[in-house]
Amino acid sequence: MSEKDLGGGKKAGFIARTWRGFWRWSARLLVAFLILSLVLVATVSVINPPTWAWRIDRALFPPKEDIQVRHQWVPLDKIAAHMQLAVIAAEDQRFTLHNGVDFAAIKTAIADRDPGEPLRGASTLTQQTAKNLFLWSSRSFVRKGLEAWFALLLDTLSGKRRTLELYLNIVEFGPGIYGVEAASRYYFNKGAGKLSTREAALLAALLPNPWSYRINPPTAYMNRRADWIARQMRQLGMATLKDLD
């Protein structure tokens, strides 16, 4: 056997060992990620998180300076049923029907998307909760994929009621205003359990853009949006909340 053949054999062996090492470490990283994600979701299923990814991101990269952070955790049964229904009506009317990811909505959003435009309108309430809890804010296909994975885990391990409780306690209702209890006290000077239907609709109307929208006093646009949410609430009906169990 010539030196050329020996050299070629050594090179091929090195490449084979490199690929084996690559796949071995990739498998280990995947297993570690799966275990970590299961632990994270299982933890927030039973323990109220002291902080979360979205809040940390805002603290590190605040859109504005000198923001006073307001937050107070409140259990779901202390949140007005109107408020629970309002966020479902505003953000995810199929919340009780899907398993965390609404594949029918994704299919529709893809069909309606203009070429070159990002995918919009397909994130479920569960996906929003997963993003706020665990992921970064910038949009990418990687983040959307992770968001879907965590949403499926949340729906499976936490269930609808706990997911809704998490969402209502960590979602941002204004600069530094986290959770419905802090929002209710800031905007209406009352606890979340005493919100009226109109007040709940106004708070839910903030959710797409809480840093830009205002409800104190509400603009004409916000009144129209709250009116639309109230109509959707009537169509869904309070019986929707029974399907959370």
UniProtKB/Swiss-Prot annotation:
The keyword RNA-binding does not apply. Pathway: Cell wall biogenesis; peptidoglycan biosynthesis. This is Biosynthetic peptidoglycan transglycosylase. One of its GO terms (molecular function) is peptidoglycan glycosyltransferase activity. Peptidoglycan polymerase that catalyzes glycan chain elongation from lipid-linked precursors. It catalyses: [GlcNAc-(1->4)-Mur2Ac(oyl-L-Ala-gamma-D-Glu-L-Lys-D-Ala-D-Ala)](n)-di-trans,octa-cis-undecaprenyl diphosphate + beta-D-GlcNAc-(1->4)-Mur2Ac(oyl-L-Ala-gamma-D-Glu-L-Lys-D-Ala-D-Ala)-di-trans,octa-cis-undecaprenyl diphosphate = [GlcNAc-(1->4)-Mur2Ac(oyl-L-Ala-gamma-D-Glu-L-Lys-D-Ala-D-Ala)](n+1)-di-trans,octa-cis-undecaprenyl diphosphate + di-trans,octa-cis-undecaprenyl diphosphate + H(+). One of its GO terms (cellular component) is peptidoglycan-based cell wall. It is a single-pass membrane protein. Keywords: Cell inner membrane, Cell membrane, Cell shape, Cell wall biogenesis/degradation, Glycosyltransferase, Membrane, Peptidoglycan synthesis, Transferase, Transmembrane, Transmembrane helix. Its main location: membrane. The keyword Glycosyltransferase applies. It holds the Pfam family Transgly. It is an enzyme of class 2 (transferase). It is found in: Cell inner membrane. Belongs to the glycosyltransferase 51 family.
